Structures are given as structure tokens and as C-alpha cells.
């Protein structure tokens, strides 16, 4: 089977890897000059398998109103003329109930835990390195109210058998001694000892190189113009003015996926959630994080690589704008100075932004569509790095008609019922096109 993958971020690249291993002929196209140069380039570096949570959570609507007036708000909204922005926000608000939060988090945990297993197996098989650390993640709570609110997450962690530790302020220093030098006295923390860290860009680049050795063809500098449709089937894509035919097309274009699908009558509720990062040269290892921490108040993570510190987070709903907002840099600098003062050189920091493809419920969209031969792997939001290996392996099983190792419930686009065309029975999510 010839598979055409549109997008060479971490999602497209892991999809290519697993489809190649399944025996498919794989071609990957991307508009950039190499793999992982957009949203995968400088994300937070956290492999948050256990911390996985949707942004749509109880209390967020009221917090969002308050955040409108805060300089360092973790979530901000910049109105645009795009009606999709308001439709997406309305859908997200509907998922902020405790009931929906539990359902969505459960789906996300299912995929994240599977992704942990997939990455472990991939790493053991290939020996791939990406400045990874297996020292856990710590969620920091500045207030007792935040700590108390973590109870609902702890209940789901217990349900899924995910190890965790609730840390007192005194216990924090055992795992992250550098916090002692900070100006914040935290109320407590939640530690997930099995979570990991690593550079997503390094992983994507190196996995692409390994996939190329297996015969996967990567074509860069390619503009994907539209999908080719023949009746109920997608038969390829127009790229740089030429038709590239394939038995199966995988759309892994992140936030840009809905733009390609719209002409087919598919209204995919994926919208860009703009994130920011600041990468600092490490100047004092004793003041740096041992692994990674997430400041719950600002939704900012501070992560250690070999010789660098990555400070990343926040979310800005502002359409497809990729300009660098100096106020967001100020927030990142404030947080790292609060928690790990003197760990990195702020003067030489690399400020970056990326558009994270978010769904209203937080769960990505992986699987079949109403069109035969067209599959999706997109909408991972802030957790593309975390979910990438599991998403790629799961998708390869679907496309190649192999039994999936996890439930497909709630993972494909049919949960939204937003297509303007009927879904053919032979193209149900659990019945991929015949190879």
C-alpha cells in the first residue's frame, strides 16, 4: 500500500515510522526544509504521560474572565474576524463540566499511557537519543486551592494505576533542590515519577533519519494545495502543482489540517492554540531543575535538557498569527526567575512560538473519515510530543487492518458529527479501506 503523509512534524514522522514498519510504501511531504520545524521545534519538552489533561476543565470559564485582566494570564483570547474561533471557544466551554472533563481526560490518558509503551519499545529497538530524562514531572501549586482541586486528577490516576506522589513543601527539595533558591513558597505539588522529558525536535529529526534508512521518502519545500477526490475516495494530493497519487492519505498538518479538509465538506474542530517558549543556555546546574516542573498558576513548564533550559507554556487564542508577543516572553522570564533564579542566561534566550492544534475536548482526532483512503492524525494540542508514538502506532494498525491495542472509542472525528456528507458504512472508523 502506498501511503502519502502530509506533514513532517512529530506526528507525521511517527506515523511514517510505524507505517513503514508495517510494510507500507511511505512518502512524507512538508513545506519546511526539514522535519519538525514548526510546532515540534521548541515545545516544552515534557513527556507528560500521566499529567495529560484537557484545557477544558471545571472552573476555566470563570478563570478565563479573570485572566482577561491579568498581565501574566495562562490563557488569553485575541478576537479575530474568523467565526471558527468563536465556534471553537463555545464548544470548548461546553466541555468544562466535571462530567465531560472526566470523560475527556480518561480518553487522553488511555492514549498517553499507550504512547508511553510505544516510545519505550521504539527507543529500545532503535537506541534513539533526544536529551531525554526519566526523572518524573512535578506540578507545582502556589495555593492550597489549586492543591485541593487536584483531587479529581488523582482519582483518575488511581483508576488507571498511574503512580503519583503528593508532596509537601518540605518534600519538594528532595526532588528539585533548585527550588530552594526561588522566591515562591509552594503549597504543595503532585509528582508523577514515570513521566519523562526530552527534546521533541531532536527526536523528530533523528526518527526521520531512521525512517529514511527504512525507505521512507521525505520531500521538503512542498506546498500541499488540495486533496484529489474521486467519488467517495481520496486518491492523492496536489503538491507543487502536480498530482501525487496514493492508496491512502494521512493528514498530519496540525493546526492547518482543517483548511485542507474544508473543501471536502469536512468541518474539523481543530483550532490553533498559540504557545510560547524561551530556550536558555544553562549557566548554573545547581540552580536548574533536575527534570521538569509545571507552575500551575501560569501553565508554564521549566525543563532541563543537557546544556539548556526550556521555559514554555501558556495559550493564546489568536488565529494563525505567529508573531512573537513580548508580553509572553516577560511571563516566561518572570516564572523562571521565580522558581529557578540564575539557572540560565536570559540575555541569550531564544524566544519562539508555535501553533498547537487543539480540539475543544482535548482529545486528538485519529482515524478514518467519511472518505475512503483519507485518515487523520491531528488535534493533539499541547500533548503532541507526549502522544506521538502511540498515535502513530495506533494509526498504522487502523490503516493496515490490524487489531488495535487500545480502544478506538472517542478518538476519531465521528465523535463530533460535523461532516456535511454521510459516512459510508464501509468506511467506519474500525473498518479502514482495503489495502
Swiss-Prot record:
Which InterPro entries does the UniProt record give?
Answer: DadA, FAD-dep_OxRdtase, FAD/NAD-bd_sf
| GO annotation terms (biological process) | D-alanine catabolic process
Give the reactions, separated by semicolons, that this protein catalyses.
Answer: a D-alpha-amino acid + A + H2O = a 2-oxocarboxylate + AH2 + NH4(+)
Q: Does the keyword Flavoprotein apply?
A: yes
**Which UniProt keyword terms apply here?**
FAD, Flavoprotein, Oxidoreductase
Q: Which GO terms describe its molecular function?
A: D-amino-acid dehydrogenase activity
Q: Which family does it belong to?
A: Belongs to the DadA oxidoreductase family.
Q: What is this protein called?
A: D-amino acid dehydrogenase
Query: Organism, per UniProt?
Result: Xylella fastidiosa (strain M12)
Coding gene? Answer: dadA
